[in-house]
Swiss-Prot record:
Pfam families: Cytidylate_kin2. InterPro entries: Cyt_kin_arch, Cytidylate_kinase_dom, P-loop_NTPase. Its EC number is 2.7.4.25. One of its GO terms (molecular function) is CMP kinase activity. Belongs to the cytidylate kinase family. Type 2 subfamily. It comes from Pyrococcus abyssi (strain GE5 / Orsay). One of its GO terms (biological process) is pyrimidine nucleotide metabolic process. SUPFAM superfamilies: P-loop containing nucleoside triphosphate hydrolases (SSF52540). The keyword ATP-binding applies. It comes from the Archaea. The lineage of its organism: Archaea, Methanobacteriati, Methanobacteriota, Thermococci, Thermococcales. ATP binds at residues 12-20. This is Cytidylate kinase. Keywords: ATP-binding, Cytoplasm, Kinase, Nucleotide-binding, Transferase. The keyword Transferase applies.
């Protein structure tokens, strides 16, 4: 692994490839992979709730979102960490590299359908509804417009590249950053 201390955030909408990229980065560089989903599961366990119970609880308690985000910020104090989450780029203001992955909703729906074993149409509807709800929630909770990509250093349309191609693009950026630290 190159020398230095980097904090990288990877954000994107459902089916854009954030988890795949983060796993590849963690494996290649030995980065610690922190993701909001894991933090959320840990919090459910801490409260003795199933994931489903905790999701319903979190919908009624905005402090859960704030705690997930706080824990992501805390993780950013470590060296050589990749933090995955829709708001990670917004929350981890001092990240060395902020990445946004995107793809047309139809492509993302196909990926989610394959991953979850549902129809593309069902995945499309779930994604569209979730994105609308999340956008409202982020605006209300933080005043953040998730569609504002101006904070990102690197924006990649993952429909144009294989997972290996996306990794190669990001690897080139990280290797360049390591030359500077």
């Amino acid at each position: 692994m190159p020398k230095g201390c980097l904090v990288i955030t990877v954000s994107g909408l459902a089916g854009s490839g954030t988890t795949t990229l983060c796993r590849n980065l963690a494996k290649h560089y030995g980065f610690k992979h922190v993701y909001a989903g894991l933090i959320f599961r840990q919090m459910a366990k801490e409260r003795g709730m199933s994931l489903e119970e905790f999701q319903k609880y979190a919908e009624l308690h905005p402090e859960i979102d704030r705690e997930v985000d706080r824990r992501q910020v805390e993780a950013a104090k470590e060296c050589n960490v990749v933090i995955e989450g829709r708001l990670a780029g917004w929350m981890v203001k001092n990240a060395d590299l902020k990445i946004w992955l995107d793809a047309p909703i139809r492509v993302r729906a196909e990926r989610v359908a394959k991953r979850e074993g549902i129809s593309v149409e069902e995945a499309f509807m779930k994604i569209a509804e979730r994105e609308m709800q999340n956008r409202k929630r982020y605006l209300n909770l933080y005043g953040i417009d998730i569609n504002d990509l101006s904070i990102y250093d690197l924006i990649i349309d993952t429909s144009k590249w294989s997972p290996e191609g996306v990794f190669a693009i990001v690897k080139a950026a990280i290797d360049h950053l390591y030359e500077k630290v």
